[in-house]
Amino acid sequence: MGQKINPNGLRLGIIRTWDSQWFVQDKEIPALIKEDYLIRELINNFSKKSAISQIEIQRLKEKTKNRIKIYIHTAKPGVIIGRDGDTRNKMVAKLKELTQKDVDLNILEVKNSEKIALLIAQNIAEQLENRMNFRHVQKMAIQKALKAGVKGIKTLVSGRLNGAEIARSEGNDEGRVPLHTLRADIDYASLQAYTTYGVLGVKVWIFHGEVLPGQTILDTRKPFVFTNNRNSKYPSRYFKGGPKNVNTKKN
């Protein structure tokens, strides 16, 4: 089951929490779910190349029922804020027009973008659209993630690779990625890359560590250093041919 299901959804309520946090009556839930979807769609379309990794939406108090707090986690805060805050103000105006509510927009900078699955997937998809070799792109992404301190990473690209007539899937992995362990902090993302040969699917799994009792996922996302017998920072197998290569045909 752990190999098929979305790892983020499987761990909700166990070690992960929801990106939308609000408490309302049952009859209001469908409207707010739709509103959250439209808010995220507007933000992502408004700033497509701002490396957004997460959008949190909060409506926590009854007094502020008509007020929405939005937290945007991004690796490029300057792109969203703009010169003198112009871009941010335009986004707030569009959000107010969409929701007809007061919007409190907060921009949070992501420090280690090489450790976040969604940003890695965005980078891979962008390079594939620029006609980079899919094997080279995956190996470079894995190398950067290992340097950033992840405990394990797995990537997969599917579709007409290099313009082949038959679609297939090809991926790389390094380190541990225990998908069946519910306490394992797995960060997962999937995106599409639109190339001249068609649409390619990009998937990324990252293992940060196990969340033990009394810990949170923030405790597992501290940098991890690979070691081997030669006291090197990276595993010896990484320098001997690179990460493992896995080929599977797509039916």
UniProtKB/Swiss-Prot annotation:
TM region(s), chain numbering: none
InterPro entries assigned to the protein according to its UniProt record, in alphabetical order: KH_dom, KH_dom-like_a/b, KH_dom_type_2, KH_sf_prok-type, Ribosomal_S3_C_sf, Ribosomal_uS3_bac-typ, Ribosomal_uS3_C, Ribosomal_uS3_CS
GO MF, any single term: structural constituent of ribosome
Entry keyword set: Ribonucleoprotein, Ribosomal protein, RNA-binding, rRNA-binding
One annotated Gene Ontology cellular component of this protein: cytosolic small ribosomal subunit
KH type-2 domain residues: 39-111
GO annotation (BP), single: translation
Alphabetized SMART domains for the sequence: KH
One Pfam family named in its UniProt record: Ribosomal_S3_C
Free-text function comment from the UniProt entry: Binds the lower part of the 30S subunit head. Binds mRNA in the 70S ribosome, positioning it for translation.
Assembly and interaction partners: Part of the 30S ribosomal subunit. Forms a tight complex with proteins S10 and S14.
Family that this chain belongs to: Belongs to the universal ribosomal protein uS3 family.
PANTHER family: 30S/40S RIBOSOMAL PROTEIN S3, SMALL RIBOSOMAL SUBUNIT PROTEIN US3C
HAMAP family: Ribosomal_uS3_B
Protein name: Small ribosomal subunit protein uS3
Encoding gene, per UniProt annotation: rpsC
